[in-house]
Amino acid sequence: MNAPERYERFVVPEGTKKVSYDRDTKIINAASFTVEREDHTIGNIVRMQLHRDENVLFAGYQLPHPLKYKIIVRIHTTSQSSPMQAYNQAINDLDKELDYLKNQFEAEVAKFSNQF
């Protein structure tokens, strides 16, 4: 079969960056971020977080091919922000949100564990 090895879905090859940045030369304040070894799960979460930013005019992602494990996130921002700032802010906000969820979950588990 022509399918790649399973480990290739999540192991970033040596010498390959996890995230690469490509500025769009045709549109001002637009760029693409290629994220290696990720899929729709991360792409959709990052896209939705970018949509919360009022300085983001467009945010979308695509999975170029089902057997190539990378996503391309495209961002177009207003002149008040840059795509790099918007991307970094989205990642930081998601990190805080997931940390909060983790802490809340652990607190509830601890409450439940103490009951028994």
UniProtKB/Swiss-Prot annotation:
Gene3D superfamilies: RNA polymerase, RBP11-like subunit (3.30.1360.10). The keyword Endoplasmic reticulum does not apply. It is found in: Nucleus. The keyword Plastid does not apply. Keywords: DNA-directed RNA polymerase, Nucleus, Transcription. It holds the Pfam family RNA_pol_L_2. GO terms for cellular component: RNA polymerase II, core complex; RNA polymerase IV complex; RNA polymerase V complex. GO terms for molecular function: DNA binding; DNA-directed RNA polymerase activity; protein dimerization activity. SUPFAM superfamilies: RBP11-like subunits of RNA polymerase (SSF55257). Belongs to the archaeal Rpo11/eukaryotic RPB11/RPC19 RNA polymerase subunit family. Component of the RNA polymerase II, IV and V complexes. Interacts with NRPD1, NRPB3 and NRPE3B. This is DNA-directed RNA polymerases II, IV and V subunit 11. The lineage of its organism: Eukaryota, Viridiplantae, Streptophyta, Embryophyta, Tracheophyta.
